[in-house]
Amino acid sequence: MLTTLLFCGCKKKIDFGPDEGITYRDNNNNPVSKIDPSDWTLDGNWSKQEKKLFDGLGVDVNSTAQGVVRNISLYPNPIETQGNFTYSVTASLSLKLVVVDRKYKVLLNTTYAPPTVGHYAFNIDFTDSKFESGESYRMYYVFYQGSTLYYKGHGDIKMAD
């Protein structure tokens, strides 16, 4: 019985992949390492744990994406205190961002609603003490309009040493 409780109580951990799973970028958003092909692109189906991060959004995050979002990145990566999240859209969409640690503990949860189409870049503050030096985190993003999923994915980020 105790074994069952311990097994069921364990949370899955994020596997960031080989070579830290981070796409390193400089202060000008130029890649300075091998690019992780699973980061900053369209994801397939998310696990139950990943879907739960977006409960209450009113969007089926495992439905078929209805649009395209381009040029998604976060720089610099690793991050010292501030990160710039960038993307380009051809429709007026809302954006939900969730940053989690390797045990899926939510550290940042925010929504943006730019008024129109275009290229966007905005600053995210990572100075909170919950972001530890040298640690890796995962940022999930969902672009949506009403209850329609337009695009979703993730990117792995690291705090500078």
What do these predicted ranges mean?
Residues 14-20, 25-31, 35-37, 138-161:
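C-terminal tail/sorting-segment detector
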Residues 60-88:
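Surface-exposed, proline-anchored Ser/Thr-rich loop/turn motifs
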Residues 97-109, 136-142:
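Short, glycine-anchored, charge-dense loop/turn motifs used at functional sites
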Residues 115-147:
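Short, surface-exposed loop/turn motifs with a glycine/proline- and acidic-biased composition
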Residues 41-65:
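A general sequence property marking short-to-moderate contiguous segments
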Residues 107-117:
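Solvent-exposed serine/threonine-rich low-complexity stretches and specific carbohydrate-binding patches
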Residues 6-9:
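C-terminal motif of bacterial Sec signal peptides marking the signal peptidase cleavage site
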Residues 90-95:
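Short proline/glycine-enriched turn/loop motifs at strand-loop junctions of beta-rich domains
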